[in-house]
A protein has these predicted regions:
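A membrane-topology feature that recognizes alpha-helical transmembrane segments
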Residues: 1-361
Length: 361
């Protein structure tokens, strides 16, 4: 009970800080200075005006200095963070795992609200979460074993990158998408195709060699999307249907996902430090690439099979809440975050139950 109460209070304080992150990070402003202030009159907030949840209630949602309305979302973020921290303390009371869970939750909350506001997922938060998941796995063997964390991150990112690739290919009626220099979706499709036929290592090598060739030549060398994605889909089918094939169906599928995800996360990191390519208003986009990178982060923390549970929850939540909020377009990132939180605590149980239901658990 004491831990739960402490977690609630801590969550409120963290939620107050997350409000600063959500407001300032998309504007590329410092989250440290200047101190918290009214967004309308720039009045510096005192300690009494910074008490999570209660300050907003006592001030009736207005600035004490200028009387301007303060969005109800500020206490909402604080209350949500406080509640989730308390829930985590009840479900995962062991240290240091609980500290990592709190950080994971804080990242997802910040990413969700930034995505709602700007339809973007900041690379600084996504890759920080990915790196933290891998570091924790290597140093603490939590939340996953080291190799499992890396594989799951690559496979999860690869899955969503392929969903985006195949979806866009169908919408474009098998026409090629935009070619980006030196690395783009076509590079990931090539890596996935080679990985599906020859293993993940070969796929990664092929993808990075294509990237290097493009960079060296100042040109884009790319196979047709229909060819790379078609052959990538054919390899696992051949592995299942043809005895003694190059790879089993599962190994081929793993090679496809790992190679695609590896190039997706590496390419995303490259573009995080480079000027983003100009957007083509006519380019078909089935899923934002930020969601692909977020999938990698979730996979590093959850494992691939629990990530699939989270993805199913995200799709279901998107269908239900998307209908309820039909008047406003809500990005997929918050739904992935909801699915990730469900999978964090219940993903392995759901997977075990499903395998038992099938009689193979």
């Amino acid at each position: 009970m004491i831990l739960t109460l402490f977690a609630f209070v801590l969550g409120g304080v963290v939620g107050s800080f997350l409000n600063v992150v959500i407001y300032r990070l998309p504007k590329k402003e410092s989250i440290v200075a200047p101190p918290s202030h009214c967004p309308h009159c720039s009045h510096r907030l005192s300690a009494l005006e910074l008490i999570p949840i209660f300050s907003w209630i006592f001030q009736r949602g207005r600035c004490r200095h200028c009387g301007a309305r303060i969005s109800a979302r500020y206490p909402l973020v604080e209350a949500l963070t406080a509640s989730l921290f308390a829930l985590a303390a009840r479900l995962q009371p062991d240290f240091p795992a609980l500290l990592l869970v709190w950080v994971f939750m804080a990242l997802l909350i910040a990413l969700s609200f930034i995505d709602i506001d700007t339809y973007t997922l900041p690379d600084s938060l996504v890759y920080a979460g990915l790196a933290l998941g891998w570091m924790a796995s290597y140093l603490l063997k939590y939340p996953l074993a080291p190799q499992a964390s890396v594989d799951s991150a690559l496979m999860s990112a690869g899955l969503l990158a392929l969903v985006a690739g195949y979806g866009a290919l169908l919408v474009r009626r098998l026409k090629d998408g935009k070619r980006e220099w030196p690395v783009g979706l076509h590079t990931m499709h090539l890596a996935g195709m080679v990985g599906a036929w020859s293993g993940p290592a070969a796929g990664l090598v092929a993808g990075f060699l294509n990237w290097a060739l493009n960079a060296r030549s100042k040109k884009v060398f790319a196979l047709p999307d229909g060819l790379t994605l078609g052959l990538a889909a054919l390899a696992p089918v051949a592995g299942y249907m043809v005895p003694g094939w190059l790879q089993s169906g599962l190994d081929s599928l793993r090679g496809l996902l790992v190679a695609t995800g590896g190039l997706a996360l590496a390419g995303g990191l490259y573009w995080a430090f480079r000027p983003e390519p100009e957007e083509d208003p006519n380019e078909v986009v089935v899923m934002g690439f930020g969601d692909v990178k977020l999938a990698g982060m979730l996979g590093a923390w959850l494992g691939f099979w629990p990530f699939l549970v989270g993805l199913m929850v995200a799709v279901l939540a998107g269908a239900v809440l998307g209908t309820a909020f039909r008047s406003r377009k809500v990005p997929f990132g918050p739904y992935l975050a909801i699915g990730g939180l469900v999978a964090l605590f219940f993903g392995n149980r759901i997977v075990s139950w499903y395998l038992s239901y099938l009689g193979i658990g």
